[in-house]
Amino acid sequence: MDLRNQYLVRSEPYYHAVGDEIERFEAAYANRIPMMLKGPTGCGKSRFVEYMAWKLGKPLITVACNEDMTAADLVGRFLLDKEGTRWQDGPLTTAARIGAICYLDEVVEARQDTTVVIHPLTDHRRILPLDKKGEVVEAHPDFQIVISYNPGYQSAMKDLKTSTKQRFAAMDFDYPAPEVESEIVAHESGVDAATAKKLVEVAIRSRHLKGHGLDEGISTRLLVYAGSLITKGIAPLIACEMALICPITDDPDLRYALRAAAQTLFA
């Protein structure tokens, strides 16, 4: 299979637009402007990027960033095999060569000295120097970089350099309005509308606890997990315990408060 076709999104991902984010992204892509998506965990940033890659008909290469990731993990390295030494492109280099959308998920998890390798690709130059190989890759006309992160987890140690931020246009994401979120949960998990609405209400109550013991409220993703368990015959209160309460806190008092909310709604 052609390398470009290998990374195409084959079927339409489900994405419920909550505003004009699709039109904004299309305008940015038309001008090959690098994009920064900011929002809480599980609010739909990654699904949005996947949907836009499908809609634009472009390959998508996703990199889950982490603190152990090095610049070589992005651009590539020399490898030894039985025939000798060969160069292996990293995901960023592959995306630049084939004209893919390169999505760096949770980019602030990577070290700052790693993320600076994207700088030449995010200005007028649109090049990627491969110093170890002595090559300069000129980005394919279709290439675009998209990064995402959760601003709620920012700290002095985990933030983007100003010189990096100012190379991107940005869009803020948040959890959808309750009626929209209920529709998403019902569609993705298969639960009925009434159950989806109750699950969303549990999540809303948890989000009110952000900064009061919880770093983050219950995400839309976790609501889909809970709904999926319910459709497989798990009792709603047990599904809430498994998918909504246990994953986000170990604090007994917070768990008690969330259980009480679930019991009120599903009694």
Swiss-Prot record:
Classification via InterPro entries: ATPase_dyneun-rel_AAA, CbbQ/NirQ/NorQ/GpvN, CbbQ_C, P-loop_NTPase
MF terms (GO), sorted A to Z: ATP binding; ATP hydrolysis activity
Pfam families associated with the record: AAA_5 (PF07728), CbbQ_C (PF08406)
Keywords carried by this UniProt record: ATP-binding, Nucleotide-binding
Positions bound to ATP: 39-46, 99-106
Protein task: May affect the post-translational activation and/or assembly of the oligomeric structure of RuBisCO.
Family: Belongs to the CbbQ/NirQ/NorQ/GpvN family.
Protein name, as recorded: Protein CbbQ
Annotated gene: cbbQ
